[in-house]
């Protein structure tokens, strides 16, 4: 009887964990609203999330070698995901600090063949002060649904190496596998 009770409790505990984990993935933590310019100087805002089933938002900076190294892989993912109505946006966290930083970011993106939007956040703006400034490890990536909610925790490190995690979250949002 003790063995049976232990088995039942263990099953309940495991079920509770997986259920809680799934709840965390579909929680409604809003991605902060923003209205910024991209690296090309065009306006972009958080309204863009509504145009796609999901959006991958990748934070990087000019001094991050691993961020720059993954850009061709992100471009490849962007091209593949476009067909599934999934967008990818980069955020060059230091590109808004000076004209020199912006020019460096533009050079990097051109050299790496990046065609997806890249935001150049204003370091004096709320988006930067309330969210971007708190990111301490690069690259850091978020998955955002069409309502502007973050799905799951941040993904730190190379996105392609964590593609299973990305695909799981995208499947929760889109129902696609």
Tell me what each language-model feature is.
Residues 143-177:
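Thiol-/selenol-based redox modules, centered on thioredoxin-like
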Residues 69-112, 123-129:
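Structural microenvironment flanking redox-active thiols in thiol-disulfide oxidoreductases
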Residues 19-47:
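N-terminal "domain-start" segment that seeds a small globular fold
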Residues 61-66, 93-98, 122-126, 150, ...:
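Solvent-exposed loop/turn segments at secondary-structure junctions
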């Amino acid at each position: 009887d003790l063995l049976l009770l232990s088995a039942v409790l263990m099953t309940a505990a495991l079920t509770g964990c997986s259920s809680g984990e799934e709840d965390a993935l579909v929680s409604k933590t809003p991605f902060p609203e923003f209205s910024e310019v991209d690296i090309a100087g065009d306006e972009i805002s958080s309204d863009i999330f509504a145009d796609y089933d999901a959006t991958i938002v990748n934070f990087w900076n000019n001094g991050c070698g691993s961020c720059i190294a993954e850009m061709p892989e992100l471009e490849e993912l962007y091209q593949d995901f476009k067909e599934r109505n999934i967008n990818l946006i980069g955020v060059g966290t230091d590109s808004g600090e000076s004209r020199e930083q912006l020019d460096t970011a533009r050079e990097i993106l051109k050299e790496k063949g990046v065609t997806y939007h890249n935001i150049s956040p204003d370091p004096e703006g709320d988006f930067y002060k309330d969210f971007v400034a708190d990111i301490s490890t690069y690259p850091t990536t978020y998955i955002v649904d069409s309502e502007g909610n973050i799905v799951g925790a941040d993904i730190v490190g190379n996105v392609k190496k964590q593609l299973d995690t990305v695909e799981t979250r995208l499947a929760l949002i889109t129902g696609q596998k």
